[in-house]
Amino acid sequence: SPVCVTHADMRLDNIFFKDGEVAIVDWQSICTSAPEQDLAYFLTQSVPQSVREQEDLVALYHAELTQNGITYDLAQCRQRYVVCALYLICYAVVIAGTLDLGNERGRKLGETIVKNTFRALLELDAFSLIKA
């Protein structure tokens, strides 16, 4: 199974766009992990359902990975994406627990992260991976 360098805090607050260019900041959590980790983090915690539904973003990501030398099939990428998304639920809970819920921005960020994450996990049927 492929691994790569991951940002490990790939949320919209850490991505800046200007004139067609993209800058990613806040690299203190960098590590090696599954390539799908950053994608799962970004799509499940920062991207609303309406955007996730527009295109097959996992397939687009997989195409970029394979064009750049990572060789594995799309089905494996999709499965690993769901596993990463399920694992990252702990990030949503931990992050929401550290925010200042007394101010509007902190409260809204916490609500957004938790709602987006659970909605995405339900869409992916990720909880079916947990054995009773």
Over which residues does each language-model region extend?
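Short acidic alpha-helical/loop segments enriched in Asp/Glu that coordinate divalent cations
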Residues: 22, 53, 73
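Catalytic activation segment of kinase domains across protein kinase-like and atypical kinase folds
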Residues: 11-42
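All-alpha amphipathic helical-bundle segments outside canonical DNA-binding/catalytic cores
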Residues: 70-85
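Active-site activation/catalytic loop segments of kinase-like enzymes and analogous catalytic loops
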Residues: 35-69, 85-106
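ATP/Mg2+ or Mg2+-diphosphate-binding catalytic cores
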Residues: 88-132
